[in-house]
From Swiss-Prot:
Keyword set includes Nucleus: yes
Basic residues bias spans: 57-69
Protein name (record): COMPASS component cclA
UniProt-listed GO biological process terms: epigenetic regulation of gene expression; regulation of secondary metabolite biosynthetic process
Keywords: Chromosome, Nucleus, Telomere
Length: 617
């Protein structure tokens, strides 16, 4: 559209706040412009003078509040520090814990009497090594349980020989020392016998199903796919990336170690890289192999771990270790076996056609997490040592070490003074839907230790042998200590599980035999015990609801002593207690004095009818 503005007249201002004057020059407004136009924002006089006088002066930047507080300039606005309150640790040692009352389960299904079904495997890839001259098929495990989110899973089978706990521990095929299906991410691929693993994605770690707790153990790992072994392809400057078909890391890791990263990222794993043979712990790499030497395809790496006896290990985590008395903790000439109170707080559940256990897993402690990822080299109370007083997780095991061999040649011992792992150095996660209470976080389920661990990246693959026949074999012991394949721990763990199942059945029979109800506790139901809970209250309202109902029911009434609890827990039968019947107090006193206590209770609550069930929930 053509403009109709007269020639010679100035165009209106593009500023929306500027008024348009008529051609006659008479303003629309008689008053000042700044008083009538609310949208106008005239510049201050100081700014106007600054613009006319010269360039704008540089604005002085004010320090942030944190800097002013650090310099002491804003003391009047610094909030008062809250008074530090010491958190009372209610955790009990594993030796003082009792079995949780078994859940009220329905009768086992006919399928529960059968062993767990073998895992379904789907073929994903095949790898061939020209150096070794062998091929491997790798499969993914379909619908597998994975230990994550603070929980650990195992398999159960119904057994009529265990009428109180109804189920006992079992495993899935293959029945040998191998990599664990449950202790590995979904991205890990296995071969048929689960002795070789690989992944096509980023770093993932697989742990074995056997662990070392004391003694000296050995396993071998052969590189299937990794850094190429052709010496002509090696870089000349030593800084370029080596040609490879993937990368791997080998070592040992505890249950707290993350499986979605490589071994050695945190304090819970010790590993060695294939590139340059660097050892890794706390996410820090150190040169270990000679310059220019790496771990390539076809190499056999031997991993040897040495741990002190559990008896000395227990004194270290309890803070009673004396170097002058206990010495350097050599395993020679010391009895390795000791009585361990295995506490397995488990919830049974059906998973497809199998029956499984769910229990709390151990979780990383704040002290070791800060020590691994913070810039400070040492914690507040000094570096980790057997005598560290800050936390049990910062204590180390004297005499422990990890030695590495390459193709039968000893490369050295890069790791010494490994971190202690017995509770309270390892703590169970407090899951509210898994019978988790603070009192039981120090429970030892018998499977806390150092596991063989392998990490793969971008197609790297490793095959392991945890027992003979070996590719090379363990070395000769320098001090006469026996060196065993860590695969021997598989049969030992079966024996330990069987013994623990029998102990659980006997304890459940003595403590909980003939008692009905859903709310449970340990042998001391007077409010002074551990207060462990279970049953349908846990499945309905969580641990908190069940625990509160148990405490309120037990503490109701004038008397809350053991004799009162004895008659208020459930069906106590006849009031005449004979020598052929064991009461609640009898079962609790069997382990103390050796014989049942058949004394008549001193008093009975008036509101309890003998011979009837009392619902505590």
């Amino acid at each position: 559209m053509a403009s109709i503005q007269p020639a010679g007249s100035s165009a209106p201002s593009s500023n929306i706040n500027s008024p348009i004057l008529p051609p006659s020059g008479t303003p629309f407004f008689n008053g000042p412009l700044s008083d009538t136009n609310t949208r106008s924002s005239p510049a201050p006089a100081s700014n106007a003078s600054a613009q006319t006088d010269g360039p704008r002066s540089k604005r002085n930047k004010r320090d942030s509040r944190k800097k002013r507080e650090a310099k002491g300039l804003d003391q009047e606005i610094v909030p008062a520090k809250k008074r530090a309150t010491a958190v009372q640790n209610t955790a009990l040692p594993s030796s003082d814990l009792n079995i949780l009352r078994p859940l009220l389960l329905a009768e086992p299904r006919p399928s529960d009497l059968l062993p767990p079904q073998p895992r379904q495997l789907n073929l994903v890839s095949r790898k061939t090594s020209e150096v070794i001259g062998q091929s491997w098929s790798f499969y993914e495990v379909v619908d597998k349980l994975t230990n994550k989110n603070g929980f650990r899973y195992s398999y159960a089978i119904a057994d009529t020989s265990f009428p109180h706990i109804k189920y006992r521990q079992t495993d899935v095929r293959p029945y040998n020392a191998r990599f664990s299906f449950e202790d590995s991410p979904a991205a890990i691929l296995f071969n048929e016998d689960a002795l070789a693993v690989t992944t096509n994605g980023p770093w993932h770690t697989a742990r074995a199903n056997v662990c070392a707790r004391e003694g000296t153990f050995y396993y071998e790992a052969r590189i299937i796919s990794g850094v190429l072994s052709d010496p002509q392809t090696a870089p000349a400057n030593g800084k370029s990336c080596l040609p490879s078909r993937g990368h791997v890391r080998l070592g040992f890791a505890r249950r707290e170690a993350d499986l979605d990263v490589n071994v050695g990222v945190d304090c819970y794993g010790y590993g060695i890289r294939d590139v340059n043979g660097e050892v890794v712990n706390r996410m820090r790499c150190e040169y270990f192999f000679p310059k220019g030497e790496s771990i390539r395809e076809g190499d056999v790496i031997g991993m040897l771990i040495t741990l002190p006896p559990l008896s000395l290990h227990k004194r270290i985590v309890e803070g009673t270790y004396d170097p002058a008395v206990d010495g350097h903790a050599s395993t020679s000439g010391i009895e390795l076996s000791m009585a361990t109170n295995v506490i397995r707080d488990r919830i049974p559940f059906h998973y497809k056609s199998d029956f499984c256990w769910q229990q709390s897993n151990v979780f990383p402690t704040k002290q070791l997490r800060d020590y691994a990822f913070n810039l400070k080299e040492t914690p507040t109370f000094g570096p980790p040592s057997p005598m560290n007083t800050e936390d049990a997780s910062l204590r180390t095991l004297p005499g422990s070490s990890i030695t590495i061999f390459k193709n039968g040649i000893k490369m050295g011992t890069p790791f010494k003074e490994l971190y202690a792992f017995l509770p309270p150095a390892s703590r169970l996660a407090n899951g509210t839907n898994n019978l988790g209470l603070g009192e039981r976080e120090n429970a030892d389920d018998g499977m806390i230790g150092y596991y063989p661990a392998v990490s793969c990246y971008g197609g790297g693959a490793v095959e392991c042998r945890f027992e003979g026949p070996w590719w090379i074999g363990p070395p000769q012991a320098e001090n006469g200590e026996p060196i065993r394949g860590i695969g021997e721990r598989f049969n030992e763990q079966i024996v330990e599980d069987v013994v623990a199942d029998i102990v659980d059945e006997v304890e459940a029979m003595l403590v909980w035999g003939g008692v009905d109800g859903d709310v449970v506790g340990n042998a001391q139901m007077d409010g002074t015990g551990t207060g462990a809970v279970g049953g349908s209250e846990v499945l309905k309202g969580g641990v908190g609801a069940a625990y509160e109902s148990a405490v309120s029911a037990v503490s109701a009434g004038p008397g809350t002593g053991p004799s009162t609890v004895e008659n208020s827990v459930g069906n106590v039968g006849s009031p005449d207690v004979g020598t052929g019947h064991s009461t609640f107090e009898d079962a609790a006193s069997v382990g103390v004095v050796g014989t049942p206590n058949t004394e008549e209770p001193a008093a009975r609550p008036e509101n309890i009818t003998v011979g009837h069930d009392v619902e505590m929930s």
